[in-house]
Amino acid sequence: AGDLAGEITGVTDGAGREFRLVLTTQAQRAEEARKQHTASLSSPDTPRPLSDSAFPDTLPGTEYGPDRGIRLSAVWLTHDPAYPESLPAAPLVRYTYTEAGELLAVYDRSNTQVRAFTYDAQHPGRMVGHRYAGRPEMRYRYDDAGRVVEQLNPAGLSYHYQYEQDRITVTDSLNRREVLHTEGGAGLKRVVKKELADGSVTHSGYDAAGRLTAQTDAAGRRTEYGLNVVSGDITDITTPDGRETKFYYNDGNQLTAVVSPDGLESRRAYDEPGRLVSETSRSGETVRYRYDDAYSELPATTTDATGSTRQMTWSRYGQLLAFTDCSGYQTRYEYDRFGQMTAVHREEGISLYRRYDNRGRLISVKDAQGHETRYEYNAAGDLTAVITPDGNRSETQYDAWGKAVSTTQGGLTRSMEYDL
């Protein structure tokens, strides 16, 4: 109703879960910014909001038309048939925006900021900085035409881009150069030739629809791809030695057969809803799939060429709940409301239990006897420590971009260095 009339505010997925999409208007965000500004004036220790009090109630139009200022601010899970009494107390994801309506930050279900963006004040919508949680910010510079001319990496390789007619030159901070030659336009521009930093050259060919039809490597070896004119499906591949592999499809564009250069054929068959019911290998061995009912998307059993049958039970969310092998040995699986595996139960009482933190990272694996292995992470999500059941601790240190630079175990430290 009102400003949100005609907007989608709820979604129900195929498993019956219901999600609420929280939409906000520019005026609502402006009012919230003014409240924060007022609060910051009365509390000097409180950081002043980015937009201060200059948060406009409306947004100017764009080249695509008026901007009503409506943005997605949060997604909530409001109904879960499998966990009706255990709904999350916080949104699954949350978004904040600048005073110009640009995406400012993304927060996960633990309310941890996982991505952040910076924009050019003189060019609304032009991103000049991007950062993942625990990582340095990547910066971007543009030319007058709005093209990226420099990508600045404070902890690694940076890149400079030079644009010419049908040619882009990419130079990294070690002065290594790659040249991309392009053809086409109006959305069909494609890279047809690459000059790599080591002096080698590769070529690519495309059809009138911009689909890849040939590739020539640095040694001059050419691979060709035949395409169905209508669907774009690959119908044949011819390798540099002239050997051809053919592909066949049904009316639903599902692969039904592959004929290799030696003449041997592998086949796939589907039922009317399009589910895979059998696969026959090049050697003639067939695996068959059976489904519980006409609506099941995942197979209940598979039977191989020897007649051995395996059984699977699935949750309404497509998670494997039980697997029984051909000897009758069964393994069962349990999951939490976020779809993460929490337990594995095997025969003879052999079980493993898993726990996760509020960001969904694995923090503990415990067996039925209570032996526990614990895991620790840094802000970027890198695994920094593993503590085994006997108390031994191994640690890993990382650089700014997540590459391991040292490992320590049993008092012994190993260091790693990298080139660029």
Name what the model sees in each region:
Residues 1-420:
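Extended charged/polar low-complexity repeat regions
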